[in-house]
Regions:
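Buried hydrophobic positions in well-ordered alpha/beta secondary-structure cores of metabolic enzymes
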Residues: 14-16, 68, 130, 195, ...
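Glycine-rich phosphate/nucleotide-binding loop
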Residues: 257-356, 363-367
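N-terminal small/polar loop signature for handling phosphorylated ligands or for N-terminal nucleophile
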Residues: 46-60, 223-264
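Flexible, glycine/charged-enriched surface loops at secondary-structure junctions
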Residues: 36-41, 201-210, 234-246, 342-354, ...
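N-terminal glycine-rich phosphate/adenylate-binding segment common to multiple enzyme folds
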Residues: 47-164, 271-275
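Glycine-rich phosphate/diphosphate-binding loop of Rossmann-like nucleotide-binding domains
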Residues: 6-25, 154-248
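Internal helix-turn-beta structural module
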Residues: 319-325, 343-406
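N-terminal alpha-helical transmembrane segments of multi-pass membrane transport
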Residues: 2-8, 18, 22-23, 28-53, ...
């Protein structure tokens, strides 16, 4: 079988631990036999981020901006325990936070549904997509550990050094903590446009939530700018498409989502989207059953698996144990990136392969071959086998080969 040509590269961002192993298996067994894979490779393992003082992450983000498409493996965001484990000189920043700040985009996450695993929320019939603002808030916050009594103030000066606002945050009588975060109008406006444009593409309603009753400037700004963009740029198109936009407090939307049938885009601020995307994934089946794409305002796309490095499987793997790791989200990331590359280049063969790659793993799972995370959630009558990683990848390759020859 002649391999599919891929003249233009994508940025490939390798990662850590078990997902790094799965990453290599997907490339070697599912992609390279069929495609002349063309990537610019960036090693974002925690060891290489340490060796390069995290410069490799900055370079990877720039590559995505230049090439327009990137695909990222799961990476470690170190805490104190990980710092000691990997002998790090500092707690390096989350690679995702660095990349999202550089691209200033919106993260869209949606569950991968299979009939063998029923959602925990029985009324959900269609996937719920989380649209997460990928800039600012606590991910770009400045923090301070207060050790003694004193006064904390919020001070703003203009570019000429003129004081425009000074507010007392709190008079500390003893130890405590401080955090200051920000966002930008232009980033919020881009977030709104990304959400509404995506909704028109996939024909789904948009629900947006904040807590503007409490945060009367910060969250209120999000609410007002979203409404402005909708009214001035999208209301007519939504009406013609039979779609709706609604705003509500986040606690209200959370309650309504649980009672909905799904099939909506839930637009969230950065932290809210971080939390709710995992909740939607777990309630739909499993965290490794979640697609994730970062879309920037200037048309850049970064695809990744919306889960961690599966450290428990990695440690068992290092002991020589056979493990059964769910590869579907990582396969979906590769499939999404290759399809987008094909769409941008007019490469119909690459688009067709990417679509088959995305379906192959799902069809294997639908036949009852399930990874460890899903096996316990499946009706025993429909469960066939829990294959280890090598066997599961072999089954997916067989299915993909059938599709390519069909």
């Amino acid at each position: 079988m002649k391999k599919i040509s891929m003249p233009n590269p994508i940025a490939e961002l390798d990662g850590d631990e078990m997902t790094r192993i799965i990453w290599a298996m997907i490339k070697d067994e599912l992609i390279k036999p069929f495609v002349e894979l063309n990537t610019e490779y960036y090693d974002l393992s925690i060891q290489n981020r340490e060796n390069t003082k995290d410069q490799v992450t900055v370079e990877a983000a720039e590559a995505i901006k230049r090439l327009k498409v990137g695909v990222k493996c799961a990476t470690i965001t170190p805490n104190l325990q990980r710092q000691q484990e990997y002998h790090l000189t500092k707690l390096w920043r989350s690679p995702n936070a660095t990349i999202r700040a550089a691209l200033d985009g919106t993260v869209f996450r949606a569950p991968i549904l299979i009939s063998k695993v029923k959602p925990v929320v029985s009324c959900w019939k269609r996937p719920i997509t989380i649209a997460r603002h990928a800039y600012g808030d606590i991910y770009r916050a400045v923090e301070y550990r207060v050790e003694c009594p004193g006064k904390a103030e919020l001070l703003f000066t203009d570019e000429n050094g003129r004081e425009l606002s000074r507010q007392t945050i709190f008079d500390f009588k003893g130890p405590g903590i401080l955090q200051a975060m920000h966002n930008r109008d232009d980033s919020i406006l881009s977030f709104a446009r990304c959400c509404f444009s995506y909704a028109l593409d996939v024909k789904q309603d948009v629900w947006f939530s904040t807590k503007d009753t409490i945060s009367k400037d910060y969250d209120q700004t999000f609410k007002l700018l979203f409404q402005k963009v909708f009214d001035e740029e999208y209301s007519e198109a939504f009406e013609q498409a039979g779609l709706r936009y609604r705003y509500a407090l986040i606690d209200d939307v959370a309650a309504k989502v649980i009672r909905s049938e799904g099939g909506i885009i839930w637009a969230c601020k950065n932290y809210d989207g971080d939390v709710m995307s995992d909740l939607i994934a777990a309630a739909s089946g499993s965290l490794p059953m979640m697609t994730s794409v970062l879309v920037s305002p200037d048309g850049c796309f970064e695809y990744e698996a919306a889960h961690g490095t599966v450290v428990d499987h990695y440690r068992r793997h290092l002991k020589g144990e056979k493990v059964s790791t769910n590869p579907l989200a990582t396969i979906a990331a590769w499939a999404g990136a290759l399809k987008k590359r094909g769409e941008l280049d007019g490469n119909t063969a690459l688009i067709g392969f990417a679509e088959k790659l995305g379906r192959a793993g799902i069809e294997v799972f639908e036949e009852g071959y399930l990874s460890e995370d899903l096996a316990a959630l499946c009706d025993p009558a429909e469960f066939r086998e829990m294959p280890d990683n090598e066997r599961l990848m072999g089954l997916i390759r067989e299915k993909l080969t059938e599709m390519m020859q069909g």
